[in-house]
Amino acid sequence: MELVLNRNVSACKGKRYTEGQLSVNGKYLCDTLEPQWRNISSLHPGKKVKGRTAIPAGRYAVTITYSPKFGRWLPLLLHVPLFTGIRIHEGNTVEDTAGCILLGKKSNEGVLCYSRCWMRRFMELLDARPEGEPIWITVR
C-alpha cells in the first residue's frame, strides 16, 4: 500500500503548522496537519524543536502497533531520521500533533475537523489491504 503526503510548505511558511493532503494508492483521502516545517536533516539537527517540527521529506515504512499513549492500534512511521514515535492519528490543531501527522478535513487555517471520522476511514483502508502487504508513505 502506497501513501503519499503532499505538503503545502510554501503556503504555511512562517506559521506554526504545515498543511497537506494524504493520498492512498493514488487517490486523495483527506487533509493533514503537522507541526511547523523546518529545513532539517542529519546535517542540520540543531533546527529541530521536539514535538514542534514536521518530519523530513522522504519515504518511510509504516507498521501498525499498539500505542499505550492512545490505547489503541495506530500507524507508526519507521526509521525517520532524527525522530522516534511518529504516528498518524486524529486531532484538530497543531497542539494535538506532538510531532505526528493528523488526519481530517481542513476547516480553517491550521484547523482540521471530522478527524475521528477520517482516521476511522483510514484505518479501515489499512485493515482491508491484503495480508502481509507492506505500507509505505512518501512525504513530499
Model-inferred region functions:
Residues 136-140:
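Divalent-metal-activated hydrolytic enzyme cores
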Residues 1-135:
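Cell wall/extracellular polymer interaction/catalysis modules
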